[in-house]
Curated annotation (Swiss-Prot):
Catalytic reaction(s) noted: a lipid A disaccharide + ATP = a lipid IVA + ADP + H(+)
Listed InterPro entries: LpxK, P-loop_NTPase
Keyword field contains Amino-acid biosynthesis: no
Record-stated family: Belongs to the LpxK family.
UniProt source species: Acidovorax sp. (strain JS42)
Protein name in the entry: Tetraacyldisaccharide 4'-kinase
Length: 338
């Protein structure tokens, strides 16, 4: 089991290898060559029309990444949806619904469970109020959403840069602070596909990853408050010195713990769990003094059994120029008659 608040030793070693072209990465490089051939072949099949991409009747924005692991794309999706709403658009969100126990196409409602629809789509639905549908085939989710909510005039796809079966009008690629790593494809590097590649906008938490698309720096920090299951806010400063058990089932749990520390909180214990962890069998620490504090994504799964858990929202700082560029691209789509 991983040390509290840290990834497993194997995950740490692989992640370290992805940042450098060392011995482990070199040993895995032949597999990356094979992966690259398969990736290129798949793209060629779509480019030549042997495999078809389905185009939906409204503009589609895909927010995703080209690296394995967490890049923070879902918070960006939520920020894009809120921006579109503020600009008068009526957005809907489609997603695969990774980690859910179901396999059908279905709507994500505020009362849905994460087991039915996935933790990230449920978080988006509750936080934005936008209609959300999940399906393995994103185009199917889009068709179902537009049929159920015909006023929707734009779709945002949470993840799916590599899901070429869905035609898209704009692509937003998100990078965490590790960027493109050593620049190699899986498994010798973190890349799901070669980078740079053509996208419309890039958001990066670290150094600019290169490529020809407009690039914008983003920063992440925790909000200054926690939220309980009833939606009540509690200033984090009131939790300083209190006995806390912090837990995170995200791709990079140590980032959450570090951000808690930056807000002045020092949990007595920290528990790192796999991304999209199913909390149905999770055992609460026996120490009754400890208050649970977690991410928003984990809270949608924890609250049914542990309504006293506190969730700390993530606050993104995205430059206004990013949204200005997004608006300009959407305006050009409208003028071209999409």
């Amino acid at each position: 089991m991983a040390a509290p608040g840290r990834p497993s030793p194997l995950a740490e070693r692989l992640r370290g290898a992805w940042q450098h072209r060392g011995a482990l990465a070199l040993a895995l490089w032949p597999l990356s060559l094979l992966y690259g051939v398969l990736t290129a072949l798949r793209r060629a099949l779509y480019r030549t029309g042997l495999l078809r991409s389905e185009r939906l009747p409204v503009p589609v924005i895909v927010v995703g990444n080209v690296i394995a692991g967490g890049a923070g794309k879902t918070p960006v999706t939520l920020a894009v949806v809120r921006h579109l709403q503020a600009r008068g658009w009526r957005p809907g969100v489609i997603s695969r619904g990774y980690g859910r126990a179901t396999a059908d196409c279905r709507e994500v409602l505020p009362a849905s469970s994460a087991a039915e629809v996935g933790d990230e789509p449920l978080l988006i639905a509750r936080a934005s109020g936008a209609p959300v549908f999940v399906a393995r085939r994103r185009a199917q989710a889009g068709r179902a959403l537009l049929a159920a909510h015909p006023a929707t005039n734009i779709l945002v796809c949470d993840d799916g840069l590599q899901h070429l079966a869905l035609a898209r009008d704009l692509e937003v690629c998100v990078f965490n602070d590790e960027g493109a790593g050593n620049g190699w494809l899986l498994p010798a590097g973190p890349l799901r596909e070669p980078w740079p590649r053509a996208v419309d906008l890039v958001l990066h938490a670290g150094s600019p990853p290169g490529g020809g698309a407009p690039q914008f720096a983003l920063s992440r920090e925790l909000a200054a408050h926690a939220v309980n299951a009833s939606g009540q806010h509690l200033p984090l400063e009131q939790l300083q010195g209190e006995p806390l058990h912090a837990l995170a089932a995200i791709a990079r749990p140590h980032d959450f713990f570090a951000m808690l520390h930056a807000r002045g909180l020092q949990p007595e214990s920290e528990e790192a769990l796999p991304d999209h962890y199913d909390f149905s069998s999770w055992k609460r620490p026996p120490d009754k003094r400890l208050r649970l504090i977690c991410t928003e994504k984990d809270a949608v799964k924890l609250w049914p059994a542990h309504p006293d858990a506190l969730a700390v929202p993530l606050a993104l700082r995205i430059p206004p120029a990013f949204f200005d560029t997004l608006d300009a691209r959407l305006a050009s789509l409208s003028s071209s008659g999409h």
